[in-house]
């Protein structure tokens, strides 16, 4: 996996190779190149490369103005405090990253995600496609048909441990639009290294949608540097 990130006049390369046995090799480099458009390409030398087209994307930063959602004492009640709206056009992928804090009272007192039509809450054209919680539970709205059978997971099982692990967990949520479908993958990595992965998909059509986060006796600190909208290189 090679990432090329441009910041001002600089370009930063990070190359991560993961061997079949799990060994990871990471190489980094940066250089001043100015601000003109550049091209990148790969070359083989007594080697052979098979491209993973689905993993080849060009991304732009998502605008994050609200960097903290809720209050640090996790006292914000349900549906009172929200993140910014993040638009997701058809064919693109939104990535959101943040640090999760919880009251620990319930399995649901963590991050919550809503995908809705392209209007503000309470607007005349506002309707929800679905709301998804961190504890493998969700519900639908008027915009499309929700299907709980489409939820899957890895790493869940002990709810007492889950509640403890979600305090300070690093969370990455990816919303990928492919055709009429949207695919959600949420990965929470606890301080002790435990990983919880939650997946969901649903048919939502091809109109513009918005996503936003909600707290419920929880508190989220956005990682703005890792919030972005990605477009496929290979259409």
Where are these regions (language model features)?
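Flexible glycan-contacting loops in extracellular carbohydrate-active proteins
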Residues: 25-57, 195-229
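Broad, structure-driven detector of short, well-ordered beta-strand segments within folded domains
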Residues: 2-6, 42, 122-137, 171-177, ...
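Short, aromatic/His-centered strand-loop micro-motif at the edge of beta-sheets
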Residues: 1-3, 146-172
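Low-complexity, Pro/Thr/Ser/Gly/Ala-rich linker/spacer regions in secreted
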Residues: 55-74, 230-235
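Predominantly extracellular/luminal cell-surface or secreted proteins
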Residues: 14-18, 45, 114-118, 185-191, ...
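Secretory/extracellular carbohydrate-interaction modules
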Residues: 38, 69-147
């Amino acid at each position: 996996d090679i990432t090329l990130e441009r910041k001002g006049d600089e370009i930063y390369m990070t190359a991560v190779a993961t061997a079949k046995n799990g060994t990871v090799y990471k190489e980094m480099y940066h250089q001043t190149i100015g601000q003109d458009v550049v091209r990148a390409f790969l070359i083989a030398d007594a080697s052979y490369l098979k491209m993973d087209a689905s993993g080849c994307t060009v991304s732009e930063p998502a605008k994050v103005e609200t960097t903290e959602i809720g209050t640090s004492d996790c006292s914000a009640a349900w549906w009172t405090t929200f993140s910014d709206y993040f638009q997701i056009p058809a064919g693109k992928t939104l990535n959101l990253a943040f640090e999760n804090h919880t009251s620990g009272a319930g399995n649901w007192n963590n991050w919550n995600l809503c995908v809705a039509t392209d209007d503000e809450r309470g607007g005349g054209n506002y309707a929800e496609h679905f709301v998804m919680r961190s504890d493998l539970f969700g519900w639908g709205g008027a915009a499309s048909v929700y299907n709980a059978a489409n939820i899957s997971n890895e790493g869940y099982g002990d709810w007492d441990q889950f509640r403890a692990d979600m305090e300070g967990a690093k969370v990455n949520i990816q919303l990928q639009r492919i055709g009429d479908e949207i695919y959600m993958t949420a990965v929470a990595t606890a301080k002790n290294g435990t990983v919880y992965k939650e997946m969901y998909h649903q048919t939502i059509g091809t109109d513009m949608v918005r996503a936003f986060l909600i707290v419920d006796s929880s508190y989220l600190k956005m990682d703005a540097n890792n919030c972005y909208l990605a477009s496929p290189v290979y259409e």
